[in-house]
């Protein structure tokens, strides 16, 4: 009896793990909400408008200088950008740093190939990431709709983000 129970538990776990890889990480098209049409300055004081990227897939990650997982996630987002930029993928890192730590943002972010935007007043983070989670990653589809959202970062999360991006690239 005990071996039957062990077998059933093992099969259940195996099925759960197998189906997890096939799950669609995207928000269903009919459930997607419009992304906030934000306007923020980059590190060089250039105004960046989300509306200027209409028709592209935009990955936005909210990060902070004090957030170790944020800094672990960024290299993976840079790799995605490098791999898919020719297919209309754009990546932005939006700093959620408070005025006390904003001076540290350029020192860290200038090493990255993806643009860092400054949300100095917290307007964008309060609307797109109201819980203030860091990192918090959103993928906006070509129609300007939020298609994927992810809280935090752990090793392996980059696979989920890439899966979502690939599925969006396949959408017509």
Role assignments for model-derived ranges:
Residues 59-60, 91, 137:
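Hydrophobic beta-strand anchors of alpha/beta hydrolase catalytic cores
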Residues 1-4:
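Positively charged n-region of N-terminal signal peptides that target proteins for export
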Residues 22-50:
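N-terminal "domain-start" segment that seeds a small globular fold
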Residues 7-16:
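Bacterial N-terminal signal peptides
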Residues 54-56, 86, 114:
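Active-site acidic short loop of glycosyltransferases
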Residues 71-110, 120-127, 163:
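Structural microenvironment flanking redox-active thiols in thiol-disulfide oxidoreductases
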């Amino acid at each position: 009896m005990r071996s039957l129970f062990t077998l059933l538990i093992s099969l259940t776990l195996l099925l759960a793990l197998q189906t997890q890889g096939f799950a669609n990480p995207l928000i269903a098209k009919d459930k997607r909400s419009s992304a906030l049409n934000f306007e923020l300055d980059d590190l060089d004081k250039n105004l960046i408008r989300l509306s200027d990227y209409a028709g592209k897939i935009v990955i936005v990650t909210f990060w902070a200088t004090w957030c170790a997982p944020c800094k672990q996630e960024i290299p993976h987002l840079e790799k995605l950008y490098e791999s898919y930029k020719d297919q209309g993928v754009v990546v932005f890192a939006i700093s959620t740093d408070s005025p006390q730590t904003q001076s540290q943002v350029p020192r860290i972010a200038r090493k990255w190939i993806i643009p860092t935007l400054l949300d100095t007043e917290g307007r964008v983070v309060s609307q797109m990431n109201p819980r203030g989670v860091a990192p918090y990653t959103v993928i906006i589809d070509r129609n300007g709709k939020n298609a994927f959202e992810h809280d935090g970062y752990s090793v392996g999360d980059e696979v989920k983000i890439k899966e979502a991006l690939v599925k969006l690239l396949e959408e017509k």
